[in-house]
Amino acid sequence: QLSQPERILDLCTGSGCIAIALATRFVDSLVDAVDIDKGALEVAMVNVDHHDLGHQVNVIESDLFAKLPAEHQYELIVTNPPYVDAAIMADLPPEFLYEPEHALAAGQDGLDLVHRILFEAPDYLSPEGLLVCEVGDSEWALKQAYPEIQFDWLRFAHGGHGIFAITYDELMTHRQLFAAYVQLLDSNQ
């Protein structure tokens, strides 16, 4: 059971629906809704205004954590980053092609952004904090990449899969592993 977090980060917010749900659930929390896509953030701002949550939800343009104030410590970071791998991207049905590619594609294994988030999150997560991340069908790739980590995979009564939770302590314990993947990604670009 998560207590009332003071500050929540919705990373890769898109239209802001997760940030809005979090603000509605945690009425005394401040929620930062972050995305790199200006168009998505415009939609998020409309949605935040529609739900009259401008006093609680702050919409921020940033490439992951890049433009977040260093002093911000979040008790909860929730993220639904792009996680579609290269093979699935190549075979997507036409209706998915209306989405911007950067909102879906995440490299060969679907985890390019997830590796970065796992590495960078401890710098913004409070010591008692929790990171919740959706990786969808890339769950198997994450388990293969980090077999020594016991991710806490969330289960739902009705649908949903590929969502894990990991604590600040676990992120710090495995930070060198995450750093190695980020270095590998950077060297391949």
Task: Identify the residue ranges that each predicted region occupies.
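Conserved SAM/SAH cofactor-binding pocket of Class I
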Residues: 1-90
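Glycine-rich, phosphate-binding/catalytic loops in enzymes
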Residues: 28, 93-96, 149-150
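Structural signal for short hydrophobic segments within the conserved structured cores
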Residues: 58-60, 102, 152
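Phosphate-coordinating loops and pocket residues in cytosolic domains that bind phosphorylated ligands
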Residues: 61, 98, 144
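Mobile active-site "lid"/loop adjacent to the S-adenosyl-L-methionine
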Residues: 82-113
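Conserved Class I SAM-dependent methyltransferase catalytic core
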Residues: 108-174
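Flexible, glycine-/basic-rich loop-and-beta segments that form/coincide
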Residues: 170-188
